[in-house]
């Protein structure tokens, strides 16, 4: 059983839900906010203890929100239901961070790209390649994952990249991929892929504006490095 201790079993002045109602969500700690979402503890831990240990065990909210359902359910006290709640909360937080009024996100600098994809990519355990398709005003109209796995120029085919841009009537594209090591320093393959896509873009009239490599809370822009 994983529902022996509930929020209502805590003293009223210690219940995070009561504190939120009385004082506002901003006064609650991360553990308290997580406790409000998860609601129930375990046989040996009340919900506050469980929420606190969960954040500590995973290394903080960033790491917690990048766990897979398999990883979460290996943690003592976390079943499928709680894992699903955490994953849903994680996805909402990522979407909110990239939300813009009117659902428009304009790219002016490489930092704008990083802000858009960092939360989703910085802790991935495999390399993932994303394509951002922009209109003539540099507003992101479409984002798609086009490849997962070790990137090299023989696998990443320009046809797959630019086919999406053509379908969506894109004026230009930006590609992003992550380095699971956390170090965004470009490899020779990264540079080769960038140059190949740049030349293909020129031929078909859809410019490659940048190639952003994501590390752990840092990034490298091929445009800033002069590769593009």
Swiss-Prot record:
Q: Where is this motif: JAMM motif?
A: 177-190
The residues that hold Zn(2+) are: 177, 179, 190
Residues of the MPN domain: 106-228
What Pfam families is this protein classified in? RadC, UPF0758_N
Q: Name one GO molecular function term.
A: metallopeptidase activity
Entry keyword annotation includes Ubl conjugation: no
Q: Which GO terms describe its biological process?
A: proteolysis
- Keywords annotated in UniProt: Hydrolase, Metal-binding, Metalloprotease, Protease, Zinc
Query: Protease among the record's keywords?
Result: yes
Gene3D superfamilies from the entry? 5' to 3' exonuclease, C-terminal subdomain, Cytidine Deaminase, domain 2
Q: Which domain of life is it from?
A: Bacteria
Entry's family note = Belongs to the UPF0758 family.
Name recorded for this polypeptide: UPF0758 protein CLI_3057
- What lineage is on file? Bacteria, Bacillati, Bacillota, Clostridia, Eubacteriales
């Amino acid at each position: 059983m994983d529902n022996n201790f509930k929020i209502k079993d805590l003293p009223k002045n210690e219940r995070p839900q009561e504190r939120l109602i009385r004082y506002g969500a901003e006064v609650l700690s991360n553990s308290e906010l997580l406790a409000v979402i998860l609601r129930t503890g375990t046989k040996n831990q009340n919900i506050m203890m469980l929420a606190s240990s969960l954040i500590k065990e995973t290394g903080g909210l960033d790491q917690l929100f990048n766990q897979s359902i398999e990883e979460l359910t290996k943690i003592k006290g976390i079943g499928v239901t709680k894992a699903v709640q955490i994953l849903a909360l994680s996805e909402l937080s990522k979407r909110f961070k990239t939300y813009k009024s009117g659902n428009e996100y304009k790219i002016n600098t490489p930092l704008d790209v990083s802000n858009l994809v960092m939360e989703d990519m910085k802790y991935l355990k495999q390399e993932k390649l994303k394509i951002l398709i922009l209109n003539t005003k540099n507003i992101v109209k479409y984002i798609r994952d086009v490849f997962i796995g070790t990137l090299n120029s023989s696998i990443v085919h320009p046809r797959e990249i630019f086919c999406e841009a053509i379908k969506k009537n894109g004026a230009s594209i930006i590609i992003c991929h992550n380095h699971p090591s956390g170090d965004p320093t470009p490899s020779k393959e990264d540079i080769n892929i960038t140059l190949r896509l740049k030349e293909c873009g020129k031929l078909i009239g859809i410019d490659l504006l940048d190639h952003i490599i994501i590390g752990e809370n840092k990034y490298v822009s091929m445009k800033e490095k002069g590769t593009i």
